[in-house]
UniProtKB/Swiss-Prot annotation:
Organism: Bombyx mori (Silk moth)
Start and end residues of each stretch annotated as Disordered: 61-88, 131-154, 314-351
Protein's recorded name: Silk gland factor 3
Record key words, sorted: Activator, Developmental protein, Differentiation, DNA-binding, Homeobox, Neurogenesis, Nucleus, Transcription, Transcription regulation
Gene designation per UniProt: SGF3
Cellular location(s): Nucleus
Length: 351
């Protein structure tokens, strides 16, 4: 009896909503049939009776619903595209938006604040963008926080630089040795100045952060291989070999001095023959002559200037004595000729 009562209402609602009862559109599940009362309420008709939503009280075993499901199983889904349907929905909203009726078709992607706003009925695209979860924002925040955890602070860099300098000195390596070892082991060649500026915290924060892991790896390897000949020790030995000072014997140095007085600037052939005769390396002899010439330049100008000044002072002294008499005449009373000279000398001076 309930089915015969609702059949005319269903037919009338289907005709008012713009869809025939036998169309595939009406054969959709119940969540799409809530749109028919909305259209009937949005476009009032004088002869249409005002009734509630009959589909909400329809039992699951209703013959009409079973008939629609059976028709839907045999007929393809040819429902119209959503764009004209949205257009009709906006036209009905222009006539009057009486109550914020929640439609399952639109309420799934529409946020609560959009349903309360009667001035801006949102579409599915805009609502889906505004109702997007905050997980992407949280994800970006985590990405920004991740590098900050790995980036050392200025206090960490200062503490590591101090520790690195102490360990380097204790292990007996110079700053040049560390730079050479980094270039050989890790492929990044650093000068002694760079290592010095790192220890003094004079590099930029970005360069300090880049250099810290390399120095930390080198320090760990140096600590673990202390006491055994490794590649680091060989590299350090090569670095110290360049700074080795050559000690020359006294007899060899005398021969070099004699040759220097004869020829301060020997030619390449003379340097080679002299090195062979003294059993020295050619580079050692060449460097010795360079250093000896620099030493001569440092010593010669003061001696020359001093000799000229002494000669000038001597001429002025004698001229002063010729004009004003002997210096003995202007001597203090304690050193007067009467007290400082013998009697014979005083007699000769009187005559």
């Amino acid at each position: 009896m309930a089915a015969t009562t609702y059949m005319p209402a269903e037919m009338e609602l289907g005709n008012i909503g713009g869809y025939h009862a036998a169309s595939p559109r009406s054969a959709e599940p119940a969540d799409m049939k809530y749109q028919h009362p909305l259209h009937s309420g949005g476009s009032p008709s004088p002869g249409a009776p005002v009734i509630g939503n009959p589909w909400t009280s329809l039992p699951p075993a209703d013959p009409w619903a079973m008939h629609q499901h059976h028709a839907h199983a045999h007929q393809p889904d040819v429902k119209p595209p959503p764009a004209p349907h949205d257009h009709r929905h906006l036209q009905h909203a222009a006539h009057g938006w009486h109550a914020p009726v929640v439609s399952p078709h639109y309420g799934a992607a529409r946020p609560s604040h959009c349903m309360e706003d009667t001035q801006c009925p949102c579409t599915n695209t805009i609502c889906s963008e505004t109702s997007s979860p905050r997980d992407p924002l949280h994800h970006h925040a985590m990405e920004r926080d991740q590098p900050e955890e790995d980036t050392p602070t200025s206090d960490d860099l200062e503490a590591f630089a101090k520790q690195f300098k102490q360990r380097r000195i204790k292990l007996g390596f110079t700053q040049a040795d560390v730079g050479l070892a980094l270039g050989t082991l890790y492929g990044n060649v650093f000068s002694q100045t760079t290592i010095c500026r790192f220890e003094a915290l004079q590099l930029s924060f970005k360069n300090m952060c880049k250099l810290k892991p390399l120095l930390q790896k080198w320090l760990e390897e140096a600590d673990s291989t202390t006491g055994s000949p490794t590649s680091i020790d060989k590299i350090a030995a090569q670095g110290r070999k360049r700074k080795k000072r050559t000690s020359i014997e006294v007899s060899v140095k005398g021969a070099l001095e004699q040759h220097f007085h004869k020829q301060p600037k020997p030619s390449a052939q003379e340097i080679t023959s002299l090195a062979d005769s003294l059993q020295l390396e050619k580079e050692v002899v060449r460097v010795w002559f360079c250093n000896r010439r620099q030493k001569e330049k440092r010593m010669t100008p003061p001696n020359t200037l001093g000799g000229e000044m002494m000669e000038g002072m001597g001429h002025a002294h004698y001229g002063h004595g010729d004009v004003h008499g002997s210096p003995l005449q202007h001597s203090p009373p304690g050193l007067s000729p009467q007290h400082g000279l013998p009697q014979g000398a005083h007699t000769l001076a009187a005559h």
